Amino acid sequence: MASEAGGIGGGGGGGKIRTRRCHQGPVKPYQQGRPQHQGILSRVTESVKNIVPGWLQRYFNKSENACSCSPDADEVPPWPENREDEHAIYADENTNTDDGRITPDPAGSNTEEPSTTSTASNYPDVLTRPSLHRSHLNFSVLESPALHCQPSTSSAFPIGSSGFSLVKEIKDSTSQHDDDNISTTSGFSSRASEKDIAVSKNTSLPPLWSPEAERSHSLSQHTAISSKKPAFNLSAFGTLSTSLGNSSILKTSQLGDSPFYPGKTTYGGAAAAVRQNKVRSTPYQAPVRRQMKAKQLNAQSYGVTSSTARRILQSLEKMSSPLADAKRIPSAVSSPLNSPLDRSGIDNTVFQAKKEKVDSQYPPVQRLMTPKPVSIATNRTVYFKPSLTPSGDLRKTNQRIDKKNSTVDEKSISRQNREQESGFSYPNFSIPAANGLSSGVGGGGGKMRRERTHFVAPKPPENEEVEAPLLPQISLPISSSSLPTFSFSSPVTSASPSPVSSSQPLPNKVQMTSLGSTGSPVFTFSSPIVKSTQAAVLPPASIGFTFSVPLAKTEFSGSNSSSETVLSSSAQDITAVNSSSYKKRSAPCEDPFTPAKILREGSVLDILKTPGFASPKVDSPALQPTTTSSIVYTRPAISTFSSSGIEYGESLKAGSSWQCDTCLLQNKVTDNKCIACQAAKLPLKETAKQTGTGTPSKSDKPASTSGTGFGDKFKPAIGTWDCDTCLVQNKPEAVKCVACETPKPGTGVKRALTLTVASESPVTASSSTTVTTGTLGFGDKFKRPVGSWECPVCCVCNKAEDNRCVSCTSEKPGLVSASSSSPAPVSLSSGGCLGLDKFKKPEGSWDCEVCLVQNKADSAKCIACESAKPGTKSEFKGFGTSSSLNPAPSAFKFGIPSSSSGLSQTLTSTGNFKFGDQGGFKLGTSSDSGSTNTMNTNFKFSKPTGDFKFGVLSDSKPEEVKNDNKNDNFQFGSSSGLTNPASSAPFQFGVSTLGQQEKKEELPKSSPAGFSFGAGVNNPPNAAIDTTATSENKSGFNFGTLDTKSVSVTPFTYKTTEAKKEDAPATKGGFTFGKVGSSSLPSSSMFVLGRTEEKQQEPVTSTSLVFGKKADSEEPKCQPVFSFGNSEQTKDESSKPTFSFSVAKPSGKESEQLAKATFAFGNQTNTTTDQGAAKPVFSFLNSSSSSSSAPATSSSGGIFGSSTSSSNPPVAAFVFGQASNPVSSSAFGNAAESSTSQSLLFPQESEPATTSSTAPAASPFVFGTGASSNSVSSGFTFGATTTSSSSGSSFVFGTGHSAPSASPAFGANQTPTFGQSQGASQPNPPSFGSISSSTALFSAGSQPVPPPIFGTVSSSSQPPVFGQQPSQSAFGSGTANASSVFQFGSSTTNFNFTNNNPSGVFTFGASPSTPAASAQPSGSGVFSFSQSPASFTVGSNGKNMFSSSGTSVSGRKIKTAVRRKK
């Protein structure tokens, strides 16, 4: 309609619409130019011109020229028609908003006012327009919309003359509305409305013309008008809803009408307008909506105002303004959509629509007045929302049909259309659009509407009868909108039906849709196809409404099994769904209220009952399971819409209802289960009491509620008790609060008393508490229960029976005191819960002197800071304290040196992980334990025992070790010197221990075995070696400890240098992480991580993977296990810089194989040991110069960076950067010079002073070390400079290797040790950073092989080794070349961390004035953390750890990176 007028053209094809648009060409959709620029006055004047003459004329002409005008009406008239009737109606009504457009009908209104009065009949139409566009669609669309809409929206559709009439009318409207540019602007100018109305009236035959018919016509015209005068068409919204459901479409009977723009402009163009016509019999409703909303603002008083005034106001209203348009939007109304439409809109509309149809021609004014109260605008708005295009087209089509059909038929058809539309809505709309001009707005939608219209046409007669009741009933709108509602059952149905007979339901549905245009199928639209099918299949669905009742369901299943099947696959589902569908459809069709009554039986409550009754089960026993769930689900929806009201009211009746204890919902007496929560109906009070459960109390309450007066329902059941904790009311039988589980006051207190007594609290205040807190007074509720006690910690009041605070679980003060032997607190707990006693300090409580926290009497330690109670003696040992207790519990003591005799301590301190305890992992303390047998069971971290010695030399006499079998323990950094109580100082961080043990066995005090971080430990190697020889201990993961037992299975000794004697050849290599187990026997290499095992005699000694320590073979005991920055100077004694980080340890003893610096990080270990003095195992930056000469045979098994120079060919433990010259079994970076395998010397620079026996071991992967030593290149010495002449540094990172003989062994010269370059001329597997004299396969710094290594500068033709600077400037290493290769510990100025060179670029801790200061000619202390110059020596001999000692500091320029701020 709007499309017709506005180019949207009534349903005329787009052409008409366009023509009309051309007509309206001057008038733009929101033409503010002409109409609005005209101004209200001009508009009003124009309106006045057309009002009386045009409007009245049209009014008469409508009746006279129903056909001719109907086209006009179609174009503008349908909308004006609506305006007339609607305007009259709406003018009086609040719906005048539509009339706003119709306002031109004020004059018409005068004429049509009777019509408007008839609109009173039309009031429903008015309602329909605004709220019941659906209803109007249902009725009017079917009735008058067919007539009016057809002409206007699609003249071709019902009214052939309408087609031309529409054009004609458009012209009329246009001509008349030429003046009515206002209407153009507003979309429906009041004049246009008048003209249209007049035409509409003409179009609408008096009988056909009902306010609805006219409205439908007017709706179409409104659309036409909208087309004519573009305006925001709310109908678009309504149309959408139409697509959603016919109810929506019906609601948006004036889909073409835009709540925003009274003009013809609608979304979807002509199609939208057509949809409006089709959708609703009240085509004007769409326009009315537009105008009406505007009018409603201005026009509510129009009923009283004169037609002229009305027109003027309407003209003003019609002017589309954002506000007016916004008001027209049905968004808010959309929700009212259902209720108003369903109730007043549909119900009233159906009945009133008929009346209006009859009366509409008669005084519309009266009806207008009636409609005013209607919240139609809202409803209209709602309708608008529902569907955009479809509603307009449907409206028009429906209007045409409606005109043809009786008003009742129209209504029923519109309902059907609604249903169909919900199912078919868009297709139907589209069909009308295609068929008639009305489809011009939305061709597709129009066509579908026509189809619907066709469907509607047969249906209208049936629907008329049924719909009269149904429309008034909510169920009708519900049926439209209930589609979603029914969809509940439908979804269920669809789910279950597929199994039973989904095919049947679909065909039936189709048939029903086509065949059963009758009212019953109409409702089916809400539910999916299934419902529709059943509705058609089962006309007796009305009877079926009882289906909701289980019995009813059974009947349907039995009688209408096929129909039911159609509805839902499951028999039960089918039964439920079918009955619901039947009931809903037929009942809504027959009478809107009838379904509700039937639904009463079939209501959700009933459904819920049915499971209880089992009659539904009876219906389909097999299907029951499925049915139960689906039925329950389905029925509630049905009952909710139709019968819930009645049944709910009944349920409220005391006699006929019982209250669910669970959800407090009133259920019917017949319901065995709560309809809401499905809780079973509770037996009577007696039964419940017998049951003894909480349920009886609930049932009692409901019983009392129903039985007693209204107030009694709110009275607590007799015997109920309020929880004094959470104030929740509990049933009499409840012993505990259901919410907080607090015991019932009477019982709880008694329990508390008993408990209190039972609890051993000496002071039983509970006895006094025994008094039950039974006082019933109100204040008593707030009184603390007798015997309750307040938690001194969190101040929560606890019951007497509680032994612990419910909140913080603190023990009850009395109980605690009883346990603690301080009974006083008990009285406190039992006593002063209420008074100021709360603030009294509990007896026996004590304040912590440290943190002032109040502690319970029984607490021996402060709960906050764990400080010992002032009076008590704290067993807790401080971190650095030494515990002298022999049996000190091995409680993972961190830094405590326990000075207890090692033997007793060892025996007693087993099993516990003492962190710093002497027995366990002593971090910075030296534990002197005489030989203690049991000592190592605990995970002693730094304990000298065999327990997991990290960087500590473990010096335990073999006998002792045998006795102890301490190996088990995981000594992290301790050296286990069992014999010597003080043997290995566990994990000495910065301490330099210069204790020389004359005897290897008596290493006890001198061996700072435990993880001496930066300490230089000078211990005589003898003690450790002797100790080691006999026993196998050290099975336990000695991390950095130096295990001196010959057999010592140094299990993962991290950095301990284990000087093991030849005595125990069976040394088990237990993964000593940094520990060097130097056992004379070919001890299996224990992965000594940083430890160097130096075994003088045992060529076979396999060094466990010594990680980064350089074991000086001079002294069998490298005690400074993991000595960080300590330079350990132990000549004869086993200097054990185990894991000496940057310790430079000159060890004078060659004979003693004990690798001293186990895992010397930056430690420079100088061991003169001839026999492959264990080179610093895993000496990180440590440069160890060992003079040990028997390196040749050492097979460094995977020693990481250690260069092993031991005469024996012990299995070399994977030395990372160590170069094992001789048979070095894949020492990673190890250059194994000596038969002794070096334990993974990480960056330590092992300097085999005199080890010439082997070809110069290429120092394996010396990170920043310059290895100038010929023989042994430090195995992966990180920053250490290896001065061994022969060492071809294998993969020396920043080190310059001067040793030419670096076999390309990956790390070792012979075996593919990682960073080890083997001096042997034999081609070695390419060592990663090692330089192989024979072949330089990625060899670092090997003179023979020139491939440039990354940072290595080889003075010879060697390719620059990675970090090595032979002659070229290594990265951080300072060589003679001084080429900066950034050798980390190199003495070169290039970024020398610990470089000796004065130009130490970034020399970290190196003392570098002398390039060879590290005792290595190459002087490239590549990242030698502890070169001889104090490099990073924490506790080193007077060397400042972090100060680069030497002029290098002065020479070095460090630029701090400064972030530039933009």
Curated annotation (Swiss-Prot):
UniProt keyword annotations, A-Z: DNA-binding, Isopeptide bond, Membrane, Metal-binding, mRNA transport, Nuclear pore complex, Nucleus, Protein transport, Repeat, Translocation, Transport, Ubl conjugation, Zinc, Zinc-finger
GO biological-process terms attached to the record: amyloid fibril formation; negative regulation of RNA export from nucleus; nuclear pore complex assembly; nucleocytoplasmic transport
UniProt xrefs under InterPro entries: Nucleoporin, Nup153_N, Retro-transposon_transp_CS, Znf_RanBP2, Znf_RanBP2_sf
GO cellular component labels: cytosol; nuclear envelope; nuclear inclusion body; nuclear membrane; nuclear periphery; nuclear pore; nuclear pore nuclear basket; nucleolus
Record text on cofactor binding: Binds at least 4 zinc ions per subunit.
Annotated localization: Nucleus; Nucleus membrane; Nucleus, Nuclear pore complex; Nucleus, Nucleoplasm
Zn-finger region bounds: RanBP2-type: 653-683, 717-746, 785-814, 842-871
GO molecular function (one): structural constituent of nuclear pore
Binding-site residues for Zn(2+) 2, renumbered to this chain: C723, C726, C737, C740
Binding site for Zn(2+) 4: C848, C851, C862, C865
Extent of the Sequence repeats: 237-238, 648-649, 710-711, 778-779, 894-895, 915-916, 950-951, 972-973, 989-990, 1013-1014, 1073-1074, 1107-1108, 1124-1125, 1161-1162, 1200-1201, 1216-1217, 1228-1229, 1263-1264, 1276-1277, 1278-1279, 1293-1294, 1306-1307, 1314-1315, 1328-1329, 1350-1351, 1362-1363, 1371-1372, 1384-1385, 1404-1405
Function: Component of the nuclear pore complex (NPC), a complex required for the trafficking across the nuclear envelope. Functions as a scaffolding element in the nuclear phase of the NPC essential for normal nucleocytoplasmic transport of proteins and mRNAs. Involved in the quality control and retention of unspliced mRNAs in the nucleus; in association with TPR, regulates the nuclear export of unspliced mRNA species bearing constitutive transport element (CTE) in a NXF1- and KHDRBS1-independent manner. Mediates TPR anchoring to the nuclear membrane at NPC.
Family to which the UniProt record says this protein belongs: Belongs to the NUP153 family.
Quaternary structure and interacting proteins, as annotated: Part of the nuclear pore complex (NPC). Interacts with TPR (via coiled coil region); the interaction is direct and provides a link between the core structure and the TPR-containing nuclear basket of the nuclear pore complex (NPC). Interacts with HIKESHI. Interacts with SENP2. Interacts with XPO5. Interacts with RAN; the interaction occurs in a GTP- and GDP-independent manner. Interacts with MCM3AP; this interaction is required for MCM3AP localization at the nuclear pore complex. Interacts with MAPK1.
Protein name (record): Nuclear pore complex protein Nup153
Organism: Mus musculus
Gene coding for it: Nup153
